[in-house]
Amino acid sequence: MTPVQINNIDHADLRVSPRAGPAFGDAANQALVFPAEFEELQREFAIIFRRRDEGLQAYALLGLDRDENLFLSGDFWTSRYVPASHQRGPFSIGMVRGTSDAVSQPMLHVDRDDPRVGDDDGLPLFLEHGGNTPYLEHVTGVLRLLYEGMESASAAYAALDDAGLLAPVTLTIDVSEERRYTVPDVLVVDVERLAALTGEPLERLHHAGILRLAILAAASLANVQQLIARKQRLPGTAA
């Protein structure tokens, strides 16, 4: 991996392919996600939480078997929305210290070792006269979401946990009469506890924007049915 800071002089003609695929880490049965995505995510994916050493993290369920992404077909996603952690492609944020400023600033980088970088059939990053293309603006927005999400997600999820809204469960998913999957060690928003919130706790979560996250995450669990339907459409999977 060779991350290089992007600029419109050295990379004026650089093109990058937005294609996806197993070679680029898209063959995964879950994707790390962040609060700013929840509204888009809940239309497509089930949102679950897991306790990690670094704290609570949220994930979108993508598949049931190991390395299975039921929303991936060849080199593109079939969902209307793609989690930002996968939208970013070969781009990343790197901290760069200016010559006259002791404070490091987040700057856009691209991995020159990624085969999508320099693809003649890819999308340009800069306009003819130096401005950013819509593709580069999109990538910048995705990375901003990820950067800000990593800063704010822990506090948001801790607020859900402190309010008693996250319940530990083992998801049981029946694809057919003969095939059952379990997803252990996850937490989901408890709908009954959410509905029972009243008074000051309810007001506090509402004003902090946490209540909305809880409602979106709870609603997203209905998408397990979509996951089952996609699994059943695979060859050799009986309904």
Model-predicted segments: where are they?
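Short beta-strand-initiation
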Residues: 42-44, 81, 88, 168
